[in-house]
Amino acid sequence: MDDSWPDPRTGVKSPNAYPYFDAEPDDGYDGDVRRRGRRRRWGRVLLALLVVLVLLAIGGYFYLDSRLKRESALDYPGRLADTPGTNWLVVGSDSRAGLSRQQRKDFATGKAAGRRTDSMMLLHTGAGGTTLVSLPRDSYVPIPGHGSNKLNAAFAFGGPKLLVRTVEQATGIRIDHYAEIGFGGFVGMVDAIGGVEMCIKEPMRDPKAGLNLKAGCQNLTGGQALGYVRTRASARADLDRVDRQRQFFGALIKKSSSPGVLLNPFRSIPLALNGTGNFLVDDGDHLLDLSRMMWSMRGVSGGDGVTTTVPIGGAGSSPAAGAYITWDRTKALQLFNALKSDKAVPKSVITK
């Protein structure tokens, strides 16, 4: 009886041809099969890892987006028609939420409840470039339903919605997005990235803001940074303060978006959690919008754009508002008309 089997590789019958009893040296056929099998397994593993990473990224985005606080700020009857480009109203409030009792004492924030505007900036991006304009809180402007008063009074009277309405009517520019952060969120963001380096020209001391800084370049902690952007203890008071606020926010955004922070999970994760947990945006805004805003501010701080304050015309006082400042109507109109038309801002209206 012929018990030989055809060799599947050569077709020649041989007693040892059956694969299970093949004693001949490996000629590479089985090795090729094993290598191809290993490659397929590694391919499936890499594909599975890629799918997991994509799902984590998507899940992380929606989780962080859900942490944003939201409030209707852009919905009121009779709004201005849309204007070209994209416009953000960026507000720093004096909300103490998120600060411990000891922090309130250390940072000299007081115990006031609620929130009031401590800084306001208009960020415009479009074909005419990117422009960041400080709106001093002591600006004397008409507030719908409340006569004329300081700009920050609009927030006190009616929150973000009335503030947006007041800014739109004072500038003629339609606001597309709103972002607000309080004291606690600001301190947390600065500390999450390990502080922000600033170069101080001369010593700064202001007990009312919990500030005591020496001259020179130094890394400011969250508490020191809060005092730095709050203090009005200088010759030009609020006008000096808005300059420092633009300067510091630019440095904060620049460091937050640097590879040293984004690629370091011990920095990027606390920053993302702290930022999204403390930012308040309009109920139509999302994390992607906020990321675009921060990227635009990063460009401005890097010199790719214009930073300025509304041209100031003078000062005054009234029983209702107390001391206030007024805008230079001619120059302010030129500034806002340029932004409203999405054109480059004339150099003659840029103030430093």
Please tell me what each predicted stretch does.
Residues 2-352:
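Non-catalytic, solvent-exposed segments at the cell envelope interface
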